[in-house]
């Protein structure tokens, strides 16, 4: 059983196979004598502790595969010297990322066999690597090789860089070359990142000379619309009537919803929906009673001749789900099939009124559509019809208004069925008897209700016709028949009215309530237009928002798709999950509504001193954001304004708050920034602030200051999407499902507060708002030149030279057109005349790259952990005292913690104490010992 599969599996799991495989090829023949007939090294049996009976002679032992057969192709890279014959030390399990703990990536910081230091010594002499003793770990080398990895490749530190230079180089020359190396390294990383992401939409929206302008104009349009809405609410007193306190949560939510309705294009009539009780959302979930109702319908079919119509109720139950499936290109065909029976029914009803002789034909068509209209005349059918209607209402939880419309339609269908059954009579007699004989046709009413729900869910604009009929009470038959053929005409006009609330004339629309889907996984190559093309298949689609990519998610993005409130959002989500964009699963899930829209902040914010500080900070933030987007600028942005902005940004903040701004919210704001105190009175009365500091003082509210602050806070929240009390900004909020969704307000105040607490709170809060207080100034031309900025004319010249090829003497080729010329000057003229668009693309590419460099907050890969931790780790190791180590490679540990001046003492490792001192030249403290004064002097006494 020695050669069983279990033995091979055990060998495959052997954790020391890497070490044995790495040094077996060099020293097996020298270590053991070759015995028996096994002259070749491959015939030697391995020393396996699990093979007790295997002989080492190898004569009768069967040849077994090598370890590498189980490990896959490729040999494991060995970090030791290839000329050493000693086996490497026991390999500890690596902990990737702890580069400052271990001496070598393969061997841990703790060397159990105390051989690694000497191996490192010889490795520095005979290493084949360019930097002795510094082969990068496997994962680091793999991670640094790609252009789109999580971190940049590791940059050489000064000691590693010195190993690549001549030994006779001076210190000043070393520092100059190392500075050039770091600059070139940074330029290379920026250029590689730009090349890797320049074709992605999110990157173009930030820096492309054309796309970025369009995006900024779009955002400025959003902000201008928000500003208009805020000014309208400020003038009519809506803003001034609310306090940003958590106790007034309902009033704050009403103000935010009012803004959303106005942003959606709503009117004052639509604002009345805020006074109404919010309606329950439309639920389209299928229940278990659905199949029971289908079975009951099948039981009512008595004639076998009518089996052809059995698919009708089943298909009508599936129709509400069909528009939201992924393959919904044939909705028009379904609508045409549904509208055709309606037109036939309308024509048949007309003929039944005017021509009594067509009664039999009318009966046939009615039977074909409604399946069994003449067999259910008993009272039991009425009870079954009512129970079916109740089950239908439970299955489709629609609004009360829609249920009333369905009942009205069912009543009219009963009247039509009664007329068709009783024969030709006058219209008045039909109407009078139709009101009395409403008991039969229970199955017909149920099927009609199915069809009405079908038509309402698939094309809600058709539901406007029952409303017109119900307004007239009973309504004449001529009006009803005249409305149905005009459905096609009305459909063209009302294609946008998907919301049921919009169809109802004269009723407010709940524009602030939406349904949404969250996309967890969007590849960087997916564009907004591709997502919109997928979402446009579903009814009720409004907009899509795509977040900026995240480096920790490998530049994958998240997205939110917004639909109208009354759509079947779960069916749409299911349809999106069955689709892939560019071979990427979007991971669509239903986005829940916001749980708490008003969230409390620290109650100390209501204190008068804190309120005055908040007014100052809010004014600075509002002024900076207004200047950034030029909201209140009278004319185009000129050089003088930009220069003044640069000067104020260098000082950290603008010196004026309301003087140079046309914003009415910032007018006369300095009147509230001047602090007042009774200093003289306190001095005369001998009052000091010691008691206040120890015992604290009660919260002092100044309603006038609070009203000014609330106006500023609401301005920042509504216009700039900045939640001041949460010190954050909600990005791309105009495209999100919930505009103005969350706001933080002042919470319940504490009983007493000390002056130290107030000052500490103000200081900490100001530090949290630094991202809004400091202006983002683009880098200057000199700064981007150091980062590798390109010149447009130089790049155009390179483009011309690259497209000028010499074939022979006096024969030149232009690869762009394939034409041949006698000289390069003719090709140059040809390119500028015939390929001007190519030259413009080169200039745009240069501007594209320079725009990326000008952004001080440009996206880029984070630095390698070894690069960022290097200054601390080197000082922690104790390495230093010169540029070049005398003979040992850096970061090597000597046996038993012996440390010369150039080396760090100790074996390292997190779970091992530092090694004992051997009394080097500089010891930590003076050692105290006992010395007998009568004893002779010797060299063993302590100092």
Curated annotation (Swiss-Prot):
Modified residues annotated as Phosphotyrosine in this record: 79
Disruption outcome: Lethality.
GO biological process: defense response to Gram-negative bacterium; mRNA splicing, via spliceosome; negative regulation of viral genome replication; primary miRNA processing; regulatory ncRNA-mediated post-transcriptional gene silencing; siRNA processing
Swiss-Prot/TrEMBL keywords: Nucleus, Phosphoprotein, RNA-mediated gene silencing
Extent of Basic and acidic residues compositional bias: 8-33, 40-49, 284-308, 340-361, 388-419, 474-493
Pfam family, one: SERRATE_Ars2_N
Modified residues (Phosphoserine): 81, 303, 309, 326, 349, 352, 426, 640, 642
Localization annotation: Nucleus
Biased composition (Polar residues): 456-473
Gene Ontology CC: one annotated term: catalytic step 2 spliceosome
Basic residues bias locations: 362-371
Residue positions, PTM Phosphothreonine: 300
Stretches for region Disordered: 1-100, 284-493, 637-662, 851-886
Low complexity bias spans: 642-653
Family label: Belongs to the ARS2 family.
Function in brief: Acts as a mediator between the cap-binding complex (CBC) and RNA-mediated gene silencing (RNAi). Involved in innate immunity via the short interfering RNAs (siRNAs) processing machinery by restricting the viral RNA production. Also involved microRNA (miRNA)-mediated silencing by contributing to the stability and delivery of primary miRNA transcripts to the primary miRNA processing complex containing drosha and pasha.
Assembly, per entry: Interacts with cbp20, Dcr-2 and pasha.
Protein name: Serrate RNA effector molecule homolog
Organism of this sequence: Drosophila melanogaster (Fruit fly)
């Amino acid at each position: 059983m020695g050669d069983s599969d279990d033995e091979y599996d055990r060998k495959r799991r052997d954790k020391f196979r890497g070490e044995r495989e790495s040094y077996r090829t060099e020293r097996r023949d020298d270590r053991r004598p070759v015995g028996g007939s096994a002259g070749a090294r491959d015939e030697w049996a391995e020393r396996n502790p699990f093979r007790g009976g295997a002989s080492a002679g190898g004569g009768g032992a069967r040849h077994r595969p090598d370890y590498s057969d189980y490990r896959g192709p490729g040999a494991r890279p060995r970090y030791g010297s290839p000329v050493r014959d000693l086996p490497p030390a026991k390999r500890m399990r690596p902990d990737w990322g702890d580069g400052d703990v271990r001496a070598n990536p393969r061997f841990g910081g703790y060397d159990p066999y105390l051989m690694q230091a000497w191996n490192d010594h010889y490795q520095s002499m005979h290493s084949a690597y360019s930097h002795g003793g510094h082969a990068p770990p496997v994962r680091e080398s793999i991670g640094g090789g790609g252009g789109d990895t999580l971190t940049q490749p590791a940059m050489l530190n000064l000691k590693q860089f010195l190993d690549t230079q001549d030994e006779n180089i001076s210190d000043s020359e070393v520092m100059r070359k190392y500075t050039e190396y770091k600059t070139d390294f940074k330029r290379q990383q920026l250029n590689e990142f730009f090349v890797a992401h320049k074709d992605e939409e999110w990157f173009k929206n930030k820096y492309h000379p054309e796309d970025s302008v369009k995006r900024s104009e779009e955002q400025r349009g959003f902000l201008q619309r928000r500003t208009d809405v805020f000014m309208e609410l400020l003038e009519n007193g809506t803003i001034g009537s609310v306090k940003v306190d958590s106790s007034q949560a309902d009033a704050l939510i009403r103000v935010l919803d009012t803004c959303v309705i106005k942003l959606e294009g709503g009117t004052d009539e639509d604002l009345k929906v805020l006074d109404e009780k919010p309606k329950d959302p439309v639920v389209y979930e299928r229940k278990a009673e659905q199949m029971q109702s289908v079975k009951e319908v099948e039981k009512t079919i008595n004639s076998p001749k009518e089996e052809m119509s059995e698919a009708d109720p089943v298909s009508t139950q599936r129709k509400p789900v069909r528009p939201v499936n992924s393959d919904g290109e044939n909705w028009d065909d379904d609508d045409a099939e549904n509208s055709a029976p309606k037109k036939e029914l309308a024509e048949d009803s007309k003929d039944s009124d005017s021509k009594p002789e067509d009664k039999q034909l009318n009966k046939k068509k009615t039977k074909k559509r409604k399946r069994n209209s003449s067999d259910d005349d008993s009272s039991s059918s009425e009870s079954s019809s009512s129970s079916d209607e109740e089950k239908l209402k439970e299955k489709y939880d629609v609004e009360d208004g829609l249920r009333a419309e369905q009942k009205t339609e069912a009543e009219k269908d009963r009247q039509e069925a009664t007329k068709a059954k009783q024969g030709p009579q006058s219209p008045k007699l039909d109407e009078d008897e139709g009101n009395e004989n409403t008991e039969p046709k229970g199955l017909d009413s149920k099927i009609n209700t199915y069809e009405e729900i079908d038509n309402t869910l698939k094309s809600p604009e058709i539901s406007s016709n029952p409303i017109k009929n119900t307004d007239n009470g009973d309504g004449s038959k001529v009006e009803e028949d005249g409305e149905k053929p005009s459905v096609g005409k009305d459909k063209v006009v009302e294609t946008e009215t998907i919301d049921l609330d919009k169809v109802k004339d004269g009723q407010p629309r709940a524009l602030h309530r939406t349904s949404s889907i969250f996309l967890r996984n969007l590849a960087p190559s997916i564009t907004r237009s591709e997502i919109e093309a997928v979402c446009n298949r579903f009814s009720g689609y409004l907009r899509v928002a795509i977040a900026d990519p995240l480096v920790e998610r490998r530049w994958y993005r998240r997205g939110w798709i917004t639909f109208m409130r009354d759509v079947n959002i779960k069916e749409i989500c299911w349809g999106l999950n069955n689709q892939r964009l560019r071979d990427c699963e979007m991971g669509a899930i239903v986005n829940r509504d916001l749980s708490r829209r008003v969230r409390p902040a620290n109650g100390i914010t209501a204190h008068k001193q804190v309120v005055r500080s908040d007014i100052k900070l809010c004014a600075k933030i509002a002024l900076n954001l207004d200047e950034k987007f030029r909201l209140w600028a009278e004319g185009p942005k000129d050089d003088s304004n930009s220069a003044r902005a640069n000067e104020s940004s260098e000082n950290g903040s603008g010196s004026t708050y309301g003087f140079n701004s046309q914003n009415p919210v910032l007018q006369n704001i300095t009147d509230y920034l001047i602090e007042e105190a009774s200093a003289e009175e306190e001095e005369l009365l001998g009052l000091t602030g010691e008691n206040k500091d120890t015992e604290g003082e009660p919260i002092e509210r100044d309603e006038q200051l609070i009203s000014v602050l609330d106006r500023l806070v609401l301005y920042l929240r509504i216009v700039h999407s900045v939640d001041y009390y949460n010190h954050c900004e909600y990005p791309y909020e105009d495209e999100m499902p919930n505009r103005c969704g969350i706001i933080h307000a002042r919470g319940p105040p504490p009983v007493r507060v000390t002056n130290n607490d107030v000052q500490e709170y103000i200081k900490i809060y100001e530090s949290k708002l630094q991202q809004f207080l400091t202006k983002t100034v683009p880098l200057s031309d000199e700064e981007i030149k150091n980062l590798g900025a390109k010149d447009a004319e130089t790049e155009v010249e390179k483009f011309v030279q690259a497209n000028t090829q010499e074939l022979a003497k006096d024969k030149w080729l232009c690869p762009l057109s394939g034409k041949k010329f006698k000289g390069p000057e003719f090709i140059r003229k040809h390119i500028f005349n015939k390929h001007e668009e190519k030259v413009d693309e080169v200039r745009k590419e240069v501007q594209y790259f320079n725009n990326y460099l000008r952004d001080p907050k440009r996206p880029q890969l984070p630095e390698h952990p070894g690069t960022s931790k290097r200054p601390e780790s080197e000082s922690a190791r104790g390495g230093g005292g010169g540029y070049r180590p005398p003979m040992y490679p850096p970061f090597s540990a000597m046996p038993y913690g012996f440390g010369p001046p150039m080396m760090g003492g100790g074996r390292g490792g997190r779970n091992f104490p530092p090694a004992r001192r051997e009394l080097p030249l500089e010891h930590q403290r003076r050692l105290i010992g006992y010395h007998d004064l009568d004893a002779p002097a010797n060299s063993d006494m302590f100092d």
